[in-house]
Design a protein with these regions (language model features):
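C-terminal and inter-domain tail/linker signature
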Residues: 1-125
Length: 125
């Protein structure tokens, strides 16, 4: 499997089902994960799997809204939900020459209040 779109479909399905063996098979040995907003970086397949298993315990779910990909690059928009709330996530992926995920750049925006100066310009949803 080396099409970026197919790799992401398999990645999110494995994450949602907590199928860590399948997820591991999609990752390059030296995968690098970064979350710029939190300034988090995780290096290596084993460390990234541990980050997911230990860092996100409990009953959470992912719903894939959109995946776009071309060649060795792809992006996804997912909704993460747990018992307390839901969060949108936008994630960028780069594949290596073997079609494995080599880099993940993850953005999880938090809800923001609308500035009063723009209230008359937008529709809230």
């Amino acid at each position: 499997m080396n099409d970026a779109h197919q790799v992401l479909v398999a990645y999110w399905a494995a994450a949602e089902s907590r199928d860590w063996d399948t997820l591991a098979g999609l990752l390059a040995e030296q995968v690098v994960y970064e979350a710029p907003q939190a300034r988090e970086r995780v290096r290596g397949r084993a460390a990234y799997l541990r980050f997911n298993v230990e860092g996100f315990p409990g009953d959470w779910h992912l719903n894939v809204e959109r995946i776009v990909g071309e060649g060795r690059h792809a992006a996804s928009w997912v909704e993460f939900s747990d018992a307390s709330d839901g969060y949108p996530g936008v994630c960028f992926f780069d594949l290596d020459e073997d079609g494995r995920i080599a880099r993940i750049t993850d953005f999880w925006p938090t809800p923001a209040e609308l500035p009063a100066s723009r209230a008359h310009l937008v529709e809230r949803y």
